[in-house]
């Protein structure tokens, strides 16, 4: 679909603007059962349900199906309120003051709304602009193929090897490394497992094929190869065994190459002299030609970043093997030659590819199911330090995880095609089927100011901004729909530094890269818990100011087990003069997610529907009984009810905090 065709789609979708009423459907009803069923399905593979929102890495994304359900309950025309009906919010203005992964913006623009999005962090803003902009997929393909060809000319020679069977030139897919550890007066190499691959028939490929003596000799040095289990048994797993005096990537020794021969197909091999020569050549070239400014890549203090510093890593570029640094540097150089309109999405694609192309990547190809060989950097929402590290070939031509080409096909091509014809899942006759929502698109047109929204649909106004002070007129927004920070989720902002330093290099003039991350509504420590309520209170006050009356509503999802989190949230809403109109509960997290497995975790979100406080005096909420037993659904439901009751009471901050503590004492 080119620009002309897209303009025709916008024209075809023009309908009379939605006529909002004094009462809002979500005040009284929400299809919890239907929303819960879809959210549970989506939680297993969110990126497949909403591919156009997953251009770049972000954390703690909320369910797209849940937010579609929320927005559908704002539709005044009952004939368009069904989940599978197109549109319904034409011309309505939706604000998200903390856009994060961009879920609200995408879901609202599909329904015909005009959207405003702010975030203090530049990455959500850049991603929203790139994923909502209507550049045709075919045009992006032309730009990408040209970029890829030029990149291959520059770096392809560093990712070649030879077939161990016929000696033909072959594409290197990835290289596996073992971690150097100190064992008394000598060094050993520690790997996660000696097994390289388990085939479907039960046979195994192991390192013993290539190192039958259990030792590797490389560049005049010899190491014994042991597993992490053996290392643990021998006590080679404490700080004394760490080798921190050498650069991070030099703590790893290459063991095995995986490649592809056009005749003999996939293979493993140990490194031969030519492979070693190629590695050394890349190391020399990178050392001579790549000079990233240290001040732009210095690792800041932070709960997760400190894990890097404790391993004597102080600059983000130290986390990349020489070939990976060449990939980044040459990509940066080529970026300066592509048309400006394509620089944003291409830079985001390169940035997100680094999660699959860093020395922190691990190996998971041992599993016979093999859902991709690469364990990406943030697979556990933290910095993990693998024993078996995997250096990927970003230009490997075959379909495999982590390559730039595969990411382009999934996050640009597939996402762009989906955006032109969004697909939902529907439960029919005891099975899920895919259904295209006719006359919807997940694309918009960027506005330069709020005045551009007049008599328009699917306009977006997105900018990096501290939402404690929003550049919007009073009574200018119909609904605020958002997902606030998780009280103490400082690790997400901290982990994002891994990408920010590179995006700042690729896009130096497109954001304020010097913003103060500590201005966000996150409690960095127990001593600073009140900051969450203070900052959020200022944001909620601004939301109250910009909301139209009488239909304006503030709606967001939230869950937390900590009574102080609920107390601070309630205090913020109280100061901003909001009352709770209704609360609903819907499934949120995948119960087998590695991030919540085996934890006393909440698997549901409370959907909170609030209205600006008015003259009405009638009280709506009854005080619930204290929670004694932990059950995710009941817990979230009760927390919503308690918030409603507290907001109607005249309680001091101290009494409010104590009420929550007593309520959640179980």
Model-derived regions, located:
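Nucleic-acid modification enzymes, centered on SAM-dependent nucleic-acid methyltransferases
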Residues: 2-95, 105, 109-473, 491-525, ...
